[in-house]
């Protein structure tokens, strides 16, 4: 068996596993669309604008699919309900990026992917968690993931709340630029013209079907692997 074939088979099994993990997270969080896949698409668009290296973009897409594995592993009912969290619940929830990092390691994700999962709730002003990183201490990919995750969360419906319009979601992101989000990443997000179209990107697919496509013509696996 050739090295190339073994590598291709390994990649295929990895992407199937990662997509299944993403589907499990989406089901647990009860998003109307496959949320993690949509985050990956938005994050990749932003990363492309920053001329991020192909391998770094691949790691970012993988981390986007795995970012909330910690919430799934914790299995807390408060994650799925409307309303504010108690102080105890919020402290508990803030453990999920570290648990997600551990779950990503168990899934044999690369170390850079594990760290992006760990840092996807770090804030530009240093008030995020778990490590209170600030500004450029946070890797660019993690800053991109923070914005993409937030935008997708605002514009994806859940059983206890409707989705925001694109206009309202953008306004919410702008309001938090320089606080939660890197202003440079927000600027790129606002420059993207096809964010609404990416809703059609987030549709259920069979992870074993390498020919599966989405409405805008992207191939799910070519996006994941390139």
Predicted regions and their residues:
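Histidine- and acidic-residue-rich, metal-dependent catalytic cores
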Residues: 2-226
